[in-house]
C-alpha cells in the first residue's frame, strides 16, 4: 500500500532499519538470508504480526549460531546441509503453505580442539529455543545424540589418530516449522563419525538405536521391523548396478512429547530412476493398499513432469566452491516415518533436481500445483523466487532447487521444495560486500530502493562475471 510519502516498507526493510547487530558477521547473515525468508512468509500469507515475530526469532536466536559468514577467502565450517557448505537452508511445504528452515548450529568452538567435530553447539542452540517456545521436549534428542554422535573421548580418538578425512563432519542440525507465531522443532543426526569411532556400520547404529528405543516405546517396533526387513532384503539381493544396496544416511525426530514424536530414517539410493523410486515408495512391494497406489501415481506424474535424467550416482565430494555452477546430479533419497501404532512405515521420496534448470523445474512444479488445484501456489511460486533473487537471470539458474520431497497420507499429497538461501534480495547491500554467486547476475538492472540508506547500496551493474 502506497502513501503520500512513498511505498510502505516491507517487514524485512523495516526490521533492517531497527535492528542492531553485534558484528558484521551477523549483519551479513541477516541481509543475505532474511529477504528470502521474508518473501516466503509473505507468499504463504503469514499475518504481518507473525512475519515480524518469525523474522525477530530468526535474527535473535538463529543467526548467532550460523558461524562465520561464508566468503571464498575465509576459513569456515562446511556443513553437509548444502552442497556449498552453507549451514542454512529454507524449505517450503507447498501443499500447506508452511515455511520451514534448517540450520547446523555453529559457535566459536566449532572445528577447534575444544569441539573438533561440532558436537556441542547444538546443545546451546536447543536450550535457547526452549526458552522461547513451549512444548519442546529433549528426551529423544538426548537419547539419539548419545547414540549417534561422538562424545569427547571419541572426538579425541578421531582427532589424535587422524581418522577424519573426507567423511561427513556434520553430526547434527535443527529444523523449525513455522506455525503462525510459534514453531515446532526437529533434530537430524548423521552418525558417520560415530561409525568411524566405534567401528559399527551406519545400519547398525541407526536401526540399533531405534530398536533399543522401542524397548521403551513399543508402538514404533512394528514399522521399524518392516523397514529393517525391506532394507535387509534389498541389500542381500544387491548384485551390481541393477540391484544396489540401500544405505542408511541419517535419522530425525520431532522434539516434542515422545508419545507424539515421529522417528524418520533416511535411506540413500544411488540409482536415480523411476523404477528405483517405485521400489522405495512401495517398500519393494510391501505397500499395496489403495492410498499407496494413489500416491504412486503422483510420484510417476512428478517424475514425468520434472524429466530427471536416469543415472547411477554416488554422493559427490568434496563440497562445491561458493559461486561454482553445478555440473552434477545427486543420488536419490527417501525417508520413512515410524508412526506410533502404525505397522507400516510411511515413505517420503526425494526428487534430486540440483543442477537442473530452475526455470524448467518451476514450470513442472507449477503444472503439478495446477492439477492439484493449489491455485495460490501455482500463481505465486515463480514470482516468489524471482522476488527472492531479483538480480539474477532466472532462465539460466540451476542451483536454487536442491530437492523436491513428496509424500501422500490420508488421501492428501504433500510436496516440499528445498532451496538455496544465500545472497538473496537486493544483494550486495554494502559496497564492500563480496558476491560469490554472480555468474548469472544481470548487469542491466539499476539499483532498486530497498528501504535502506542509499549510501549502503552497491549497484548491481558494478558486478563483473
UniProtKB/Swiss-Prot annotation:
InterPro entries: Aro_prenylTrfase, Aro_prenylTrfase_DMATS, DMATS-type_fun, Trp_dimethylallylTrfase. Its EC number is 2.5.1.34. Substrate binds at residues 100, 186, 188, 262, 264, 266, 348, 350, 414, 418. It catalyses: L-tryptophan + dimethylallyl diphosphate = 4-(3-methylbut-2-enyl)-L-tryptophan + diphosphate. L-tryptophan binds at residues 80-81, 89, 190, 249. Pathway: Alkaloid biosynthesis; ergot alkaloid biosynthesis. Disulfide bonds: none annotated. GO terms for biological process: ergot alkaloid biosynthetic process. GO terms for molecular function: tryptophan dimethylallyltransferase activity. Keywords: Alkaloid metabolism, Transferase. Transmembrane segments: none annotated. Belongs to the tryptophan dimethylallyltransferase family. Catalyzes the first step of ergot alkaloid biosynthesis. Ergot alkaloids, which are produced by endophyte fungi, can enhance plant host fitness, but also cause livestock toxicosis to host plants. Homodimer. NCBIfam families: arom_pren_DMATS, trp_dimet_allyl. This is Tryptophan dimethylallyltransferase. The gene is dmaW.
